[in-house]
């Protein structure tokens, strides 16, 4: 029973890490990356549709994204969605494909993005601590219901704390890696 608490917590930690990696992927680092467009939805025939379901996205050069719509009639809708997004990138429409040239980041922009990385990372740490709290509460509940002894509870709490520390350390290394990526020119 005690192992299931730790296993559940570790599974939730892994989901938090995956979510953080996705969020970091959406923060542009001056290089073209198709994941920059993951959060863009296009109003297509009246329904919000993810961009990656309407077009293939390729990276022909280091700072260029090429969007090739499956339906050429959707090109204006895709262009509008990109313009309305918070990417700050102007699409170039040549009638059949859309090119996005990722501008080089200024020093000021790099520092702003690094702050954003820290903020997103801190939110992930809060999620980890909430998972730890839930696991600790579950362990105390089991001890209260006499499913585990007090000694088993103490051991379980130590194991939960160690798993939490490992998860937080992984987040710290992910933050440091993304900041390094952003701040290197």
From Swiss-Prot:
Domain of life per record: Bacteria
Cell compartments where the protein resides: Cytoplasm
Listed Pfam families: RRF
Keyword Cytoplasm appears in the UniProt entry: yes
Keywords from the UniProt entry: Cytoplasm, Protein biosynthesis
CDD domains referenced in this protein's UniProt entry, alphabetically: RRF
Gene Ontology MF terms in the entry: ribosomal large subunit binding
Biological process (GO), any one: translational termination
SUPFAM superfamilies: Ribosome recycling factor, RRF
Gene3D superfamilies documented for this protein: 3.30.1360.40, Ribosome-recycling factor
GO cellular component, one term: cytoplasm
Purpose: Responsible for the release of ribosomes from messenger RNA at the termination of protein biosynthesis. May increase the efficiency of translation by recycling ribosomes from one round of translation to another.
Family statement drawn from the similarity comment of this UniProt entry: Belongs to the RRF family.
Name under which the protein is recorded: Ribosome-recycling factor
Species in which this protein is naturally found: Streptococcus thermophilus (strain ATCC BAA-250 / LMG 18311)
Record lineage: Bacteria, Bacillati, Bacillota, Bacilli, Lactobacillales
Gene designation per UniProt: frr
């Amino acid at each position: 029973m005690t192992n299931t608490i730790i296993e559940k917590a570790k599974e939730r930690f892994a989901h938090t890490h995956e979510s953080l990696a996705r969020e970091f992927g959406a923060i542009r680092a001056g290089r073209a990356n198709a994941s920059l467009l993951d959060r863009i939805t296009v109003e297509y025939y009246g329904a919000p549709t993810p961009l990656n379901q309407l077009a293939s996205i390729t990276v022909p050069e280091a700072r260029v994204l090429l969007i090739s719509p499956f339906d050429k009639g959707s090109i204006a809708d895709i262009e509008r969605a990109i313009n309305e997004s918070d990417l700050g990138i102007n699409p170039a429409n040549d009638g059949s494909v859309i090119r996005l040239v990722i501008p080089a980041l200024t020093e000021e922009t790099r520092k702003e993005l690094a702050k954003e990385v820290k903020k997103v990372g801190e939110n992930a740490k809060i999620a980890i601590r909430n998972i730890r709290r839930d696991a600790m509460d579950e362990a105390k509940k089991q001890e209260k219901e006499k499913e585990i002894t007090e000694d088993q509870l103490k051991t379980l709490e130590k194991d939960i704390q160690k798993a939490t520390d490992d998860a937080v350390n992984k987040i710290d290394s992910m933050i440091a890696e993304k900041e390094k990526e952003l701040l290197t020119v």
